[in-house]
Amino acid sequence: MQPSRNFDDLKFSSIHRRILLWGSGGPFLDGYVLVMIGVALEQLTPALKLDADWIGLLGAGTLAGLFVGTSLFGYISDKVGRRKMFLIDIIAIGVISVATMFVSSPVELLVMRVLIGIVIGADYPIATSMITEFSSTRQRAFSISFIAAMWYVGATCADLVGYWLYDVEGGWRWMLGSAAIPCLLILIGRFELPESPRWLLRKGRVKECEEMMIKLFGEPVAFDEEQPQQTRFRDLFNRRHFPFVLFVAAIWTCQVIPMFAIYTFGPQIVGLLGLGVGKNAALGNVVISLFFMLGCIPPMLWLNTAGRRPLLIGSFAMMTLALAVLGLIPDMGIWLVVMAFAVYAFFSGGPGNLQWLYPNELFPTDIRASAVGVIMSLSRIGTIVSTWALPIFINNYGISNTMLMGAGISLFGLLISVAFAPETRGMSLAQTSNMTIRGQRMG
């Protein structure tokens, strides 16, 4: 039976919705787990006798785990398939979360944080590749933007659960173990999901892919063909692909480091709302997360109307302006601080969404998950450095100069975007993965 429709012509169906919902469970858990440790520290610090060094190690341990997980398991997913790893890593997150409830020393907690960082990091390249490869050209931007928003949903849920458990004796154990509940729900949802059709095709399992398409959509479905050559992990570092690795890692870093800087205004904003102390600080964090989550929503629509390149350039320009205002007017009133913070948070959604969308579009199926993993690992270097260096910089140079530094980094992101950001709107994965950094197509 000859295919009557192309995959990109299929309507958004129940299988697309299920893959999007359960696939975005990984970013949800990342936001949940990373934020929950901050809420739990109020009880953890006296319970395990943590000092400042241990608190710093716990944060660094999770980031180090993410670094390992993203870089290693993206490669493994490209080799063994999306679905198998899709299930294994979510089981591991749940098991480690439960095990964390029984730690009795800082060393044990550190080991658990490194391990959970590894398995959460593993899910990112797997899930984003799965969702991308199951999305049509029209759906792709919305789907990847949804992933970015789910991080903030997870962070918000963590603050709400932490608020609820704040007064419970030994509540920190339940806080850290509570991630097992969404893990179970996500595992149940993922269990019935199929393998990525594009991955099957690239592995020569054509008949299996055809049978799966008939089962899911009731008819054979055609795919735009990617270039037939075999792509290997080391090809990420060749002349064609490595410029894209550096480009996406750069815009990711230029978005993340200033975001950490502007978060220093968080206490002022939540203090204005009377939510800055003790238990209420968890509710204050919800406000901050909502600022950034709202910024992820407009790009879901604009990426397919305005396009990738204009949205990235415009967003970095507005983010630079907001940071510059905060740096150049040090004694501005609190409501102007809130306004500048809101402008930054709103426009950060553009780069925030594109740092997930671009690597999934610009690399072929054979190395897509590997590319996401390597790029995310490189971006984590910036995260680790900013986490360590930002408090020192603020202490030595003040908040105004810190904001100007952030504006400079954001400006660098703007210049890189003007020079190199490609436009992939309306193009199939076969077309986008065949581009060069100059916008030309190979073959």
Swiss-Prot record:
It holds the Pfam family Sugar_tr. Residues 40-53, 106-113, 167-173, 263-282, 330-334, 395-401 are periplasmic. One of its GO terms (molecular function) is transmembrane transporter activity. Residues 1-18, 75-84, 135-145, 195-241, 304-309, 358-373, 423-443 are cytoplasmic. The chain crosses the membrane at residues 19-39, 54-74, 85-105, 114-134, 146-166, 174-194, 242-262, 283-303, 310-329, 335-357, 374-394, 402-422. The keyword Glycoprotein does not apply. It is found in: Cell inner membrane. Keywords: Cell inner membrane, Cell membrane, Membrane, Transmembrane, Transmembrane helix, Transport. Gene3D superfamilies: MFS general substrate transporter like domains. PROSITE patterns: MFS (PS50850). One of its GO terms (cellular component) is plasma membrane. One of its GO terms (biological process) is response to oxidative stress. Its main location: membrane. CDD domains: MFS_SV2_like. It is a multi-pass membrane protein. InterPro entries: MFS_dom, MFS_sugar_transport-like, MFS_trans_sf. Belongs to the major facilitator superfamily. Sugar transporter (TC 2.A.1.1) family. This is Putative metabolite transport protein YaaU. It comes from Escherichia coli (strain K12). The gene is yaaU.
